[in-house]
Each structure stands twice: as structure tokens, then as C-alpha cells.
């Protein structure tokens, strides 16, 4: 942007980029999540991270939720052997829980977070690309600026109020790659807290919608 006086020199809609094969097409599935978020503490316009983490990792229904996520992966993946995915989690503990659960059920996975060393991140990326692991479960990283074209599955494992974050995370799977026909997106949607504003979090003005 510095070369253009901090102005966009050009832009393209998401739909046009996909049609022109600049980005990968995607299939989006909203998957029912039986976890009830109605009683999770609401703080500063969002769910309390600790309470949400506890619900996803230590509650009675934590294993049941992880099992349903694994089933959805199997159901919506064209071939489980070819899956190379990123799962976006609410916390380090949640990412570690998901990776551990998948490893126990023969879906090799790694958890990464903002404290992970660069060599660990680079190693995880290589393993995902080569198929040595199926998933990277992450929090606070990989939202943007990460290039792993091989990613063909994206899991939204926590609610978000931010359209920007949602699009950034979706974008991790939109790069073109050899043998990659489309991206599979699984968004796990639960019963929300009554204060959760679906429209407010994802409302875009007319100009933004037109640019997509």
C-alpha cells in the first residue's frame, strides 16, 4: 500500500476471484452443535473464554461434542485419507484437547498457539502438507498471513462476533493447490446466549457486500 499512497490499487470480489480460478471454490456446511451456550458468562460483548473453554474441554458433553465433530469430518469429507485441515479453537487448552482427541481416534493432529516456536509451526505445516498429520488445531495464529495451499478443510469450532476474523480464517483454505477441487468448511452452530447478536456480528453494509 505504501507504493499507492496507502490506497487500494485494485480489488476483486470473492465470487469473481473464485470464478476466475484465482481462489478455490468452497462448500459451506452449518453443522448442528448440541452444546448449549445460553448459560456461558457474557463479558465485554463476547463469551467468557474460560467458561467457553471449560464447556468445550471438561464438561460432561465435551467428549460428545468432539465425537460429533469427528463424525462430521467423516461425513462431509470426500476422502478422509486426503483431509488436510485447520481447526480454529477458543483457547490453547481447547486446541490441545481437540488435537489429543483426534490423535486418540486415528486422526493425527497437532495443536499450535501464539506461544509455539517457529520451528514447531514450520514443522506442523510441513507435516500437514505431506499428509503426516490431518489437522492443525490453533488459537490466535493462522488467522492471516499464513500460506498453506494444501489446506482443504476448515473447522470453525467456536463462535465469533467478527466478520473480519471469519473471512480471514475462511481464507486459510481458499488458496489453489494441485489436486484440490474445493474447500470444505464446517461451521459448528450451537444454541447461543441470548445476548449473542448474529446480525450485529456479521452485518455488512451494501458496499462491502457488493465487493464480495
Predicted features along the sequence, with ranges:
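Conserved strand-helix element at the start of the C-terminal RecA-like helicase core
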Residues: 55-103
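Conserved helicase ATPase core of P-loop NTP-dependent helicases/translocases
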Residues: 86, 95-143
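Post-DEXD/H (motif II) to motif III coupling segment of the RecA-like Helicase ATP-binding lobe
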Residues: 1-29
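Non-catalytic, charged low-complexity extensions flanking SF2 helicase motor domains
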Residues: 205-212
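Conserved segment of the helicase C-terminal RecA-like domain
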Residues: 162-168, 172-204
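Conserved nucleotide-binding/hydrolysis micro-motifs of P-loop NTPases
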Residues: 1, 16-19, 32-37, 93, ...
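SF2 helicase motor core recognition
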Residues: 21, 136-154, 170-175
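Short, basic/glycine-rich phosphate-binding loops at helix/coil junctions
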Residues: 34-55
